[in-house]
Amino acid sequence: MIEKAFSLLAGERLRQLIKENYSSQEEFAFDYPMDLRTVSRYINNGITKIDTIQELAEFFKVPFIAFFEVK
């Protein structure tokens, strides 16, 4: 598990990546595949598991550290 501040940064980065690459959270949830409620929870409450962040980084083809950068 990671610190709350970092998990919130990861959730915000996920929101940005979805916005840049998909027309909606629903479209991303279908493509990933992930339950829409889980996508919403990650965006609003953060991502607490490092392996989940790593999987998302690989999916979006961005470096793992990109989930913790402030933009």
Which role fits each region the language model picked out?
Residues 33-48:
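Recognition helix of helix-turn-helix/homeodomain-like DNA-binding domains
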Residues 45-58:
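Short, basic-rich loop-to-helix N-cap that marks the start of a DNA-contacting helix
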Residues 1-23, 27:
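A short, Lys/Arg-rich alpha-helix, primarily the initiator
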Residues 61-71:
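Short C-terminal boundary/hinge segments that cap the last helix of small helical domains
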